[in-house]
Swiss-Prot record:
Tissue and organ expression note: Highest levels in the stem. Present in the leaf, root and flower, but not in seeds.
Class of enzymatic activity (EC top level): transferase
Designated gene of the protein: MPK1
Domain Protein kinase: 32-319
Entry keyword Nucleotide-binding: yes
Protein name: Mitogen-activated protein kinase 1
One of the protein's GO biological processes: auxin-activated signaling pathway
GO molecular function: ATP binding; kinase activity; MAP kinase activity; protein kinase activity; protein serine kinase activity
EC number: 2.7.11.24
Length: 370
């Protein structure tokens, strides 16, 4: 539970109060009353809370010492920029970003999201029975949210069950946009250690420079398979092993299906793998609906140019009971998400402060040089 504590050094900043949760100090706006910690990651701690002004339950994510690691600072800045613009019922809403007291010295960032009950990873791990209707509804919402994100010219690039938040009535929302990029960005290959390998498309594993929205479709296919089988379909131990597992299940690829590989060494590796006839997905998932298997086969295609698109997936017969072509408006404007990878800390700090001001316009009149 949350414990009210004295401020560090006994100095209380105006408009803030202080709580300890899981040995972590939260310095938060007084309108938020924390309930309990609900999650922890490399970034810090998340707690549930009530906004006493609106009586709404929210999740507060504390990102500790955000400038200690420049990559993490850039991830946070991207998330702020993106979620300020995205408005869709299958994308998590960022409600507030708390304003620090001092612009030039703040280290921690507090993000306030709508509160969800759990995530798809926890549901898949649980003993909760997942019917065909469950799988269909989760997949439909994931595709709807992704179609909207792609319409804003954005690749998510880190879709996995843990980044899909779910509430008690099975509403699903995509979260964690720290790795998202504009889909026309070139030459920004993904940093190995931050990308989740099991959901990574072949073209990323093969270090192809020219990738697009189909990388997210591959991840959706992996998530769909995990919903059907209650375990990840490709549990590789490292990059080459991941490729080997993919070929084992999909089967050895024809020469024309390797044309997209622009890295000669990577192409040689794929050709060197022992022949595999592949495995039948209907045998892997004997309880799955025949149309579910058909859609999964169209998502888990090695060659990205032959993989089904999000729009096509929504129009697949498996989605027919849920899909309404008139209920999927695109994002209003393509979002300029480009954040220079080489920004110095002072510039990241300045841009982050400006993002915070969108939620607290009155703060722009205050002295920010401290």
């Amino acid at each position: 539970m949350a414990t009210l504590v004295d401020p560090p050094n006994g100095i209380r900043n105006e408009g803030k109060h202080y709580f300890s949760m899981w040995q972590t100090l939260f310095e938060i706006d007084t309108k938020y009353m924390p309930i309990k910690p609900i999650g922890r990651g490399a970034y810090g701690v998340v707690c549930s809370s009530v906004n006493s002004d609106t009586n709404e339950k929210v999740a507060i994510k504390k990102i500790h010492n955000v400038y200690e690691n420049r990559i993490d600072a850039l991830r946070t800045l991207r998330e702020l920029k993106l979620l300020r613009h995205l408005r869709h019922e299958n994308v998590i809403a960022l409600k507030d970003v708390m304003m620090p007291i001092h612009k030039m010295s703040f280290k921690d960032v507090y993000l306030v999201y709508e509160l969800m009950d759990t995530d798809l990873h926890q549901i898949i791990k649980s003993s909760q029975v997942l019917s065909n209707d469950h799988c269909q509804y989760f997949l439909f919402q994931l595709l709807r949210g992704l179609k909207y994100i792609h319409s804003a010219n954005i690749l998510h690039r880190d879709l996995k069950p843990g980044n899909l938040l779910v509430n008690a009535n099975c509403d699903l929302k995509i979260c964690d946009f720290g790795l998202a990029r504009a889909s026309n960005t070139k030459g920004q290959f993904m940093t190995e250690y931050v990308v989740t390998r099991w959901y990574r498309a072949p073209e990323l594993l093969l270090c192809c420079d020219n990738y697009g929205t189909s990388i997210d479709v591959w991840s959706v296919g992996c998530i769909f398979a995990e919903l059907l089988g209650r375990k990840p379909i490709f549990q590789g131990t490292e990059c080459l092993n991941q490729l080997k597992l993919i070929v084992n299940i999909l089967g050895s690829q024809r020469e024309e299906d390797l044309e997209f590989i622009d890295n000669p060494k990577a192409k040689r590796y794929i050709r060197s793998l022992p022949y595999s006839p592949g495995m039948s997905l209907s045998r892997l998932y004997p309880g799955a609906h025949v149309l579910a298997i058909d859609l999964l086969q169209k998502m888990l295609v090695f060659d990205p140019s032959k993989r089904i698109s999000v729009s096509e997936a929504l129009q697949h017969p498996y989605m027919a009971p849920l899909y309404d072509p008139n209920a999927n408006p695109p994002a209003q404007v393509p979002i300029d998400l480009d954040v220079d990878e080489d920004l110095r800390e002072e510039m990241i700090r300045e841009m982050m402060w400006n993002e915070m001001l969108h939620y607290h316009p009155q703060a722009s009149t205050l002295n920010t040089e401290l």
